[in-house]
A protein has these predicted regions:
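The feature marks proteins involved in alpha-glucan
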Residues: 1-17, 25-34
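Substrate-binding/active-site clefts of carbohydrate-active enzymes
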Residues: 21-41, 47-170
C-alpha cells in the first residue's frame, strides 16, 4: 500500500538515535532470539518508542557494510564504511532470502510511519569501505574507479582519512 510519512514540526520533534542491532539485540529488549538485532525486532519495539513520545528515529548506518572491515580481532559494529548506499544491511534482517533485507527494511519503515514516527538515515557519502588502491573491490571501484572516486595520477586521494574519497563534485 501507499506509505505516507508523518510531518512533525521541528519544535515538536523528539529524535531517538539508535543502532538497529544494538537497540534490539540485548536480552533486556525482551525479543525472541530469532528477531533480536533485526529490522523486524525494531518493529516489535515500536510501542516502546511511542510510549516514550518519540516522533523520529535516526538510524545509525543501515546500508550494506563489511562487518569484518576492522582491526584484527575486532568487528565494524557501527557501519560507517559503506559497501553500497542502496542496499539494506543484510545481517540486520531475520529473513535471509534474497529480498529479505529489503522487504524487512521496507516493512520497518512503513510500521514506524504508521505509528507516527519519522525515519532519518545516518549516511556517509564521503568514502566507501573499498579503501585505497590496495583495498578490496566491492562495487564502485569495479564499476568506474575514476568516476566514483577522486583520483590523481592513477591513485586514490584520501581526503576522508578512510583510504578514498568519493567524487561528489561531478
Amino acid at each position: 500500500g501507499i506509505d505516507t510519512y508523518p510531518h512533525h514540526s521541528l519544535e515538536n520533534t523528539i529524535i531517538y538515535e539508535m543502532h538497529v542491532k544494538g537497540f534490539t539485540k540485548d536480552k533486556s529488549s525482551g525479543l525472541n532470539e530469532k528477531i533480536a538485532g533485526t529490522y523486524k525486532g525494531l518493529i516489535e519495539k515500536i510501542p516502546y518508542l511511542v510510549e516514550l513520545g518519540i516522533t523520529a528515529v535516526e538510524l545509525m548506518p543501515v546500508y550494506q557494510f563489511d562487518e569484518d572491515d576492522a582491526r584484527p580481532h575486532m568487528k565494524n559494529y557501527w557501519g560507517y564504511s559503506p559497501m553500497s548506499f542502496f542496499a539494506p544491511q543484510d545481517s540486520y534482517s531475520s529473513d535471509k532470502s534474497i529480498t529479505g533485507p529489503l522487504d524487512e527494511f521496507r516493512d520497518m519503515v512503513k510500521a514506524l510511519h504508521k505509528n507516527g514516527i519519522e525515519v532519518i538515515l545516518d549516511v556517509v557519502y564521503n568514502h566507501t569501505s573499498e579503501g585505497d588502491d590496495f583495498g578490496p573491490t566491492y562495487c564502485y571501484k569495479g564499476f568506474d574507479k575514476n568516476g566514483y572516486y577522486i583520483i590523481n595520477n592513477g591513485y586514490h586521494q584520501n581526503f576522508s582519512g578512510c583510504g578514498n574519497s568519493l567524487n561528489a563534485n561531478q
